[in-house]
Amino acid sequence: MATTETATDREAIASVVQLYIDGASKGDAAKLEEAFHEDARMFGSLGGQRYDVPISALIEEMTSQPLDSDGSFEARITSIEQVGDAATATVEEDGCWGGVSFTDFFTLVKIDGSWKITVKTFAHTGGEMPAA
């Protein structure tokens, strides 16, 4: 299968995903808004609750409850795949809200020369959510 991935695109994709990581960890709405397309959505399930929400709901949640609540948050981009103006990226997150782990799958699209996250799908991979 042929790929049209370039180093420049790969770096740009990684930068956009890093904006998400930085914004979510510290509750920085400006970074999150820069990373996501305005019509992006988030999907997943956590504690029996299914999520299918506009990205504005994620941004609101991350600004009110940043992932790095106690300094133990770690995230790493584990893969980036790109063909033309479409890409995927996977992020492993540990220490969310003190001890919850997730795997995030991002779909990105290059629009007018800029990469934007259009979909975030997450899987809860460990730890218990803190009591509200």
Which residues does each PLM region occupy?
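Generic secondary-structure microfeatures
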Residues: F36, G44-L46, K110
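Short, low-complexity N-terminal intrinsically disordered segments enriched in polar/charged residues
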Residues: M1-A30, E34-E38, G127-A132
